[in-house]
Amino acid sequence: MEILKNKRILNKKIKNANKIFIMAHKNLDLDALGSSIGMYKILKSRKKDCYLVIDDKTHELGVEKILKELDGCLDVITSDKIEANLSKNMKKNLLLILDTNKKDLVQSETALKLIPNKVIIDHHGVGKNTIKDAFIIRDDNTSSTCEMITNLIENYEIELDPYFATIILSGIVLDTNNFTLKTTAETYYAAYYLSSLGASAKKVQYLLKQDILEYTERQKLLTRLEVIDDKIAFTKATSSTIYRREDLAKIADTLLFFNNIESSFVIGKLDQDTVGVSARSLGNYNISKILEKLGGGGDEYNGACVFKKKSISQVEKLVKEQIKKQEGE
Protein backbone atom coordinates (compact mmCIF):
# COMPACT_ATOMS: atom_id res chain seq x y z
CA MET A 1 0.00 0.00 0.00
CA GLU A 2 2.19 2.78 -1.35
CA ILE A 3 -0.14 5.51 -0.17
CA LEU A 4 0.20 4.45 3.46
CA LYS A 5 3.98 4.13 3.11
CA ASN A 6 4.04 7.77 2.01
CA LYS A 7 1.44 8.98 4.49
CA ARG A 8 3.95 10.91 6.62
CA ILE A 9 5.12 13.00 3.66
CA LEU A 10 1.55 13.54 2.46
CA ASN A 11 0.46 14.57 5.97
CA LYS A 12 3.25 17.12 6.17
CA LYS A 13 2.37 18.66 2.82
CA ILE A 14 -1.32 18.86 3.75
CA LYS A 15 -0.55 20.32 7.17
CA ASN A 16 1.69 23.03 5.72
CA ALA A 17 -0.81 24.12 3.05
CA ASN A 18 -3.35 26.90 3.47
CA LYS A 19 -5.06 26.31 0.13
CA ILE A 20 -5.35 22.89 -1.51
CA PHE A 21 -6.54 22.28 -5.07
CA ILE A 22 -7.61 18.81 -6.24
CA MET A 23 -7.82 17.82 -9.87
CA ALA A 24 -7.89 14.63 -11.92
CA HIS A 25 -7.71 13.90 -15.65
CA LYS A 26 -9.81 15.40 -18.42
CA ASN A 27 -13.05 13.59 -19.25
CA LEU A 28 -13.71 12.60 -15.66
CA ASP A 29 -14.76 9.03 -14.99
CA LEU A 30 -16.01 7.54 -11.73
CA ASP A 31 -12.53 6.63 -10.49
CA ALA A 32 -11.20 10.13 -11.11
CA LEU A 33 -14.22 11.85 -9.57
CA GLY A 34 -14.65 9.31 -6.76
CA SER A 35 -11.03 9.57 -5.63
CA SER A 36 -11.14 13.38 -5.90
CA ILE A 37 -14.26 13.55 -3.75
CA GLY A 38 -12.75 11.09 -1.28
CA MET A 39 -9.65 13.28 -0.93
CA TYR A 40 -11.86 16.36 -0.64
CA LYS A 41 -13.71 14.76 2.30
CA ILE A 42 -10.41 13.84 3.97
CA LEU A 43 -9.23 17.45 3.69
CA LYS A 44 -12.54 18.88 4.90
CA SER A 45 -12.38 16.60 7.95
CA ARG A 46 -9.09 18.35 8.73
CA LYS A 47 -10.69 21.78 8.30
CA LYS A 48 -8.58 22.55 5.22
CA ASP A 49 -9.54 25.15 2.64
CA CYS A 50 -9.78 23.06 -0.53
CA TYR A 51 -11.28 23.08 -4.02
CA LEU A 52 -12.08 20.63 -6.78
CA VAL A 53 -10.83 21.90 -10.15
CA ILE A 54 -13.13 20.77 -12.96
CA ASP A 55 -12.98 22.28 -16.45
CA ASP A 56 -14.91 19.59 -18.35
CA LYS A 57 -17.96 21.06 -20.10
CA THR A 58 -19.66 17.71 -20.62
CA HIS A 59 -19.56 14.54 -18.54
CA GLU A 60 -20.26 10.85 -18.84
CA LEU A 61 -23.62 9.87 -17.37
CA GLY A 62 -22.47 8.70 -13.92
CA VAL A 63 -20.26 11.73 -13.36
CA GLU A 64 -23.05 14.04 -14.47
CA LYS A 65 -25.46 12.42 -11.99
CA ILE A 66 -23.03 12.87 -9.10
CA LEU A 67 -22.18 16.49 -9.87
CA LYS A 68 -25.86 17.34 -10.25
CA GLU A 69 -26.81 15.61 -7.00
CA LEU A 70 -23.93 17.24 -5.09
CA ASP A 71 -24.43 20.70 -6.61
CA GLY A 72 -23.76 23.21 -3.83
CA CYS A 73 -22.16 20.58 -1.55
CA LEU A 74 -18.67 20.78 -3.04
CA ASP A 75 -16.34 23.73 -3.62
CA VAL A 76 -15.84 23.35 -7.38
CA ILE A 77 -13.92 25.91 -9.42
CA THR A 78 -12.68 26.21 -13.00
CA SER A 79 -9.18 27.15 -14.14
CA ASP A 80 -10.02 30.83 -14.51
CA LYS A 81 -10.84 31.02 -10.77
CA ILE A 82 -7.65 29.38 -9.48
CA GLU A 83 -5.43 32.46 -9.31
CA ALA A 84 -7.99 34.43 -7.32
CA ASN A 85 -8.19 31.66 -4.73
CA LEU A 86 -4.46 31.10 -4.26
CA SER A 87 -2.76 31.86 -0.97
CA LYS A 88 -0.51 34.92 -1.34
CA ASN A 89 2.34 32.83 0.05
CA MET A 90 2.89 30.46 -2.89
CA LYS A 91 4.60 27.93 -0.62
CA LYS A 92 1.27 27.51 1.16
CA ASN A 93 -0.57 26.28 -1.94
CA LEU A 94 -0.78 22.56 -2.70
CA LEU A 95 -2.00 20.82 -5.86
CA LEU A 96 -3.18 17.22 -5.53
CA ILE A 97 -3.35 15.42 -8.88
CA LEU A 98 -5.39 12.22 -8.86
CA ASP A 99 -5.80 9.32 -11.30
CA THR A 100 -3.27 10.58 -13.81
CA ASN A 101 0.39 11.54 -13.87
CA LYS A 102 0.45 12.92 -17.42
CA LYS A 103 0.71 16.69 -17.92
CA ASP A 104 -1.31 16.59 -21.14
CA LEU A 105 -4.24 14.78 -19.50
CA VAL A 106 -4.93 16.95 -16.45
CA GLN A 107 -8.07 19.03 -16.06
CA SER A 108 -6.13 22.27 -15.73
CA GLU A 109 -2.76 23.19 -17.21
CA THR A 110 -3.23 26.51 -15.45
CA ALA A 111 -3.06 24.74 -12.09
CA LEU A 112 0.17 23.02 -13.13
CA LYS A 113 1.74 26.36 -14.04
CA LEU A 114 0.52 28.35 -11.03
CA ILE A 115 1.07 25.87 -8.19
CA PRO A 116 4.66 24.66 -7.73
CA ASN A 117 3.95 22.32 -4.80
CA LYS A 118 2.41 19.17 -6.32
CA VAL A 119 1.55 15.64 -5.21
CA ILE A 120 0.37 12.93 -7.59
CA ILE A 121 -1.73 10.00 -6.34
CA ASP A 122 -2.21 7.50 -9.14
CA HIS A 123 -2.31 3.85 -10.18
CA HIS A 124 -1.20 4.26 -13.80
CA GLY A 125 2.24 3.71 -15.29
CA VAL A 126 4.61 6.60 -15.93
CA GLY A 127 5.86 7.76 -19.33
CA LYS A 128 7.56 10.60 -21.15
CA ASN A 129 4.65 12.97 -20.43
CA THR A 130 4.68 12.29 -16.68
CA ILE A 131 4.72 15.49 -14.61
CA LYS A 132 8.31 15.93 -13.44
CA ASP A 133 8.07 18.50 -10.64
CA ALA A 134 5.78 16.54 -8.32
CA PHE A 135 6.03 14.11 -5.43
CA ILE A 136 4.51 10.93 -6.85
CA ILE A 137 2.61 8.33 -4.84
CA ARG A 138 2.00 5.63 -7.40
CA ASP A 139 0.87 2.03 -7.08
CA ASP A 140 0.25 0.29 -10.38
CA ASN A 141 -0.62 -2.92 -8.53
CA THR A 142 -3.72 -1.22 -7.14
CA SER A 143 -7.01 -1.53 -9.00
CA SER A 144 -7.90 2.14 -8.92
CA THR A 145 -7.15 5.49 -7.37
CA CYS A 146 -10.40 5.07 -5.42
CA GLU A 147 -8.88 2.00 -3.75
CA MET A 148 -5.82 4.05 -2.77
CA ILE A 149 -7.99 6.81 -1.30
CA THR A 150 -10.11 4.24 0.55
CA ASN A 151 -6.92 3.07 2.29
CA LEU A 152 -6.39 6.64 3.48
CA ILE A 153 -10.00 7.07 4.57
CA GLU A 154 -9.79 3.95 6.72
CA ASN A 155 -6.37 4.85 8.11
CA TYR A 156 -7.51 8.35 9.02
CA GLU A 157 -10.82 6.97 10.38
CA ILE A 158 -12.81 9.48 8.33
CA GLU A 159 -16.56 9.56 8.94
CA LEU A 160 -18.10 9.26 5.49
CA ASP A 161 -21.71 9.72 4.42
CA PRO A 162 -23.05 6.55 2.71
CA TYR A 163 -23.52 8.37 -0.60
CA PHE A 164 -19.87 9.45 -0.69
CA ALA A 165 -18.84 5.88 0.12
CA THR A 166 -21.04 4.74 -2.78
CA ILE A 167 -19.35 7.18 -5.17
CA ILE A 168 -15.90 5.90 -4.22
CA LEU A 169 -17.03 2.27 -4.52
CA SER A 170 -18.37 3.00 -8.00
CA GLY A 171 -14.86 4.06 -9.03
CA ILE A 172 -13.46 0.71 -7.91
CA VAL A 173 -16.24 -1.20 -9.68
CA LEU A 174 -15.62 0.77 -12.88
CA ASP A 175 -11.87 0.29 -13.02
CA THR A 176 -12.02 -3.42 -12.15
CA ASN A 177 -14.86 -4.00 -14.62
CA ASN A 178 -17.03 -5.28 -11.77
CA PHE A 179 -14.11 -7.05 -10.02
CA THR A 180 -13.00 -9.05 -13.07
CA LEU A 181 -9.74 -7.18 -13.78
CA LYS A 182 -6.78 -6.17 -11.60
CA THR A 183 -8.58 -7.28 -8.45
CA THR A 184 -6.71 -8.38 -5.32
CA ALA A 185 -7.63 -9.23 -1.74
CA GLU A 186 -6.95 -5.56 -0.92
CA THR A 187 -9.47 -4.51 -3.57
CA TYR A 188 -12.16 -6.71 -2.06
CA TYR A 189 -11.30 -5.39 1.38
CA ALA A 190 -11.61 -1.78 0.20
CA ALA A 191 -15.05 -2.62 -1.22
CA TYR A 192 -15.99 -4.30 2.07
CA TYR A 193 -14.82 -1.28 4.05
CA LEU A 194 -16.84 1.14 1.92
CA SER A 195 -19.85 -1.14 2.30
CA SER A 196 -19.38 -1.01 6.07
CA LEU A 197 -19.68 2.78 5.77
CA GLY A 198 -23.01 2.36 4.01
CA ALA A 199 -22.05 2.21 0.33
CA SER A 200 -24.97 0.86 -1.68
CA ALA A 201 -24.39 -1.72 -4.43
CA LYS A 202 -27.77 -0.78 -5.87
CA LYS A 203 -26.79 2.88 -6.14
CA VAL A 204 -23.44 1.90 -7.67
CA GLN A 205 -25.35 0.20 -10.47
CA TYR A 206 -27.42 3.37 -10.88
CA LEU A 207 -24.23 5.41 -11.31
CA LEU A 208 -22.86 2.88 -13.81
CA LYS A 209 -25.94 2.90 -16.04
CA GLN A 210 -25.09 3.79 -19.61
CA ASP A 211 -26.73 5.96 -22.21
CA ILE A 212 -28.43 3.69 -24.77
CA LEU A 213 -27.30 5.68 -27.81
CA GLU A 214 -23.69 5.82 -26.60
CA TYR A 215 -23.74 2.09 -25.84
CA THR A 216 -25.12 1.32 -29.31
CA GLU A 217 -22.45 3.49 -30.93
CA ARG A 218 -19.73 1.65 -29.03
CA GLN A 219 -21.09 -1.74 -30.02
CA LYS A 220 -20.59 -0.84 -33.69
CA LEU A 221 -16.87 -1.24 -33.07
CA LEU A 222 -17.42 -4.92 -32.28
CA THR A 223 -18.63 -5.50 -35.84
CA ARG A 224 -15.19 -4.39 -37.07
CA LEU A 225 -13.33 -6.84 -34.85
CA GLU A 226 -10.13 -8.49 -36.05
CA VAL A 227 -8.24 -11.17 -34.11
CA ILE A 228 -4.44 -11.27 -34.39
CA ASP A 229 -2.54 -14.50 -33.61
CA ASP A 230 -5.68 -15.98 -32.05
CA LYS A 231 -5.24 -13.93 -28.87
CA ILE A 232 -5.17 -10.20 -29.65
CA ALA A 233 -8.48 -8.44 -30.30
CA PHE A 234 -8.14 -5.40 -32.55
CA THR A 235 -10.78 -2.98 -33.75
CA LYS A 236 -10.93 0.52 -35.18
CA ALA A 237 -13.67 3.09 -35.61
CA THR A 238 -14.60 4.92 -38.77
CA SER A 239 -13.17 8.40 -39.22
CA SER A 240 -16.65 9.93 -39.17
CA THR A 241 -17.35 9.17 -35.49
CA ILE A 242 -15.86 10.96 -32.48
CA TYR A 243 -15.42 8.91 -29.30
CA ARG A 244 -14.44 9.79 -25.75
CA ARG A 245 -11.41 8.12 -24.17
CA GLU A 246 -13.66 6.21 -21.79
CA ASP A 247 -15.71 4.86 -24.73
CA LEU A 248 -12.61 3.31 -26.27
CA ALA A 249 -11.58 1.96 -22.86
CA LYS A 250 -14.96 0.31 -22.33
CA ILE A 251 -14.76 -1.46 -25.68
CA ALA A 252 -11.23 -2.62 -24.87
CA ASP A 253 -12.54 -4.02 -21.57
CA THR A 254 -15.40 -5.81 -23.33
CA LEU A 255 -13.08 -7.49 -25.84
CA LEU A 256 -11.25 -9.29 -23.03
CA PHE A 257 -14.37 -11.33 -22.31
CA PHE A 258 -14.12 -13.19 -25.62
CA ASN A 259 -12.70 -16.71 -25.57
CA ASN A 260 -8.88 -16.99 -25.97
CA ILE A 261 -8.39 -13.22 -26.05
CA GLU A 262 -5.48 -12.07 -23.87
CA SER A 263 -5.24 -8.43 -24.93
CA SER A 264 -7.19 -5.83 -26.88
CA PHE A 265 -6.50 -2.66 -28.86
CA VAL A 266 -9.15 -0.13 -29.85
CA ILE A 267 -8.55 2.86 -32.14
CA GLY A 268 -10.88 5.81 -32.61
CA LYS A 269 -10.98 9.57 -33.15
CA LEU A 270 -11.09 11.70 -29.99
CA ASP A 271 -11.54 14.92 -31.95
CA GLN A 272 -10.96 16.09 -35.51
CA ASP A 273 -7.18 16.21 -35.04
CA THR A 274 -6.62 13.43 -32.49
CA VAL A 275 -6.71 9.64 -32.70
CA GLY A 276 -6.69 7.63 -29.48
CA VAL A 277 -5.62 4.07 -28.75
CA SER A 278 -6.92 2.21 -25.71
CA ALA A 279 -5.46 -1.16 -24.76
CA ARG A 280 -6.24 -3.80 -22.16
CA SER A 281 -4.59 -7.06 -21.11
CA LEU A 282 -5.25 -9.92 -18.72
CA GLY A 283 -1.65 -9.52 -17.61
CA ASN A 284 -0.09 -12.12 -19.90
CA TYR A 285 0.76 -9.72 -22.73
CA ASN A 286 2.99 -6.66 -22.40
CA ILE A 287 0.80 -3.87 -23.76
CA SER A 288 2.75 -1.17 -21.90
CA LYS A 289 5.88 -1.91 -23.95
CA ILE A 290 3.92 -1.42 -27.18
CA LEU A 291 2.25 1.77 -26.00
CA GLU A 292 5.49 3.28 -24.73
CA LYS A 293 7.07 2.72 -28.15
CA LEU A 294 4.11 4.67 -29.57
CA GLY A 295 4.56 7.57 -27.15
CA GLY A 296 1.93 6.49 -24.64
CA GLY A 297 2.06 4.50 -21.46
CA GLY A 298 0.33 2.13 -19.12
CA ASP A 299 0.95 -1.02 -17.14
CA GLU A 300 0.47 -4.75 -17.65
CA TYR A 301 -3.32 -4.41 -17.53
CA ASN A 302 -4.27 -1.14 -19.25
CA GLY A 303 -2.83 1.73 -21.19
CA ALA A 304 -3.40 4.33 -23.86
CA CYS A 305 -1.75 6.71 -26.28
CA VAL A 306 -2.82 9.55 -28.56
CA PHE A 307 -1.71 10.76 -31.97
CA LYS A 308 -2.07 14.26 -33.39
CA LYS A 309 -2.51 14.94 -37.10
CA LYS A 310 -2.64 11.26 -38.07
CA SER A 311 -5.44 9.26 -39.66
CA ILE A 312 -6.96 6.14 -38.14
CA SER A 313 -5.35 4.06 -40.89
CA GLN A 314 -1.92 5.52 -40.13
CA VAL A 315 -2.32 4.80 -36.43
CA GLU A 316 -3.56 1.29 -37.19
CA LYS A 317 -0.39 0.63 -39.18
CA LEU A 318 1.84 1.91 -36.37
CA VAL A 319 0.08 -0.17 -33.71
CA LYS A 320 0.16 -3.35 -35.79
CA GLU A 321 3.84 -2.84 -36.56
CA GLN A 322 4.62 -2.72 -32.84
CA ILE A 323 2.44 -5.76 -32.16
CA LYS A 324 4.28 -7.66 -34.89
CA LYS A 325 7.66 -6.64 -33.49
CA GLN A 326 6.71 -7.79 -30.01
CA GLU A 327 5.34 -11.07 -31.31
CA GLY A 328 8.65 -11.64 -33.10
CA GLU A 329 10.76 -11.07 -29.99
Mark where each language-model region is.
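An acidic intrinsically disordered interaction segment
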Residues: M1-L10, A111-V119, D140-T145, I149
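Hydrophobic helix-and-loop "lid/oligomerization" segment in the mid-to-C-terminal part
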Residues: E2-N27, G34-C73, A84-L94, L174-E329
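A generic local secondary-structure boundary/capping motif
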Residues: N11, E83-L86, Q107-T110, I136-R138, ...
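Short, acidic Gly/Pro/Ser/Thr-rich loop/turn segments
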Residues: D29, K103-L105, V126-K128, F179, ...
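Glycine-rich, phosphate-binding/catalytic loops in enzymes
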Residues: M39-Y40, L112-I115, I137, A190
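Short alpha-helices
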Residues: I121-A191
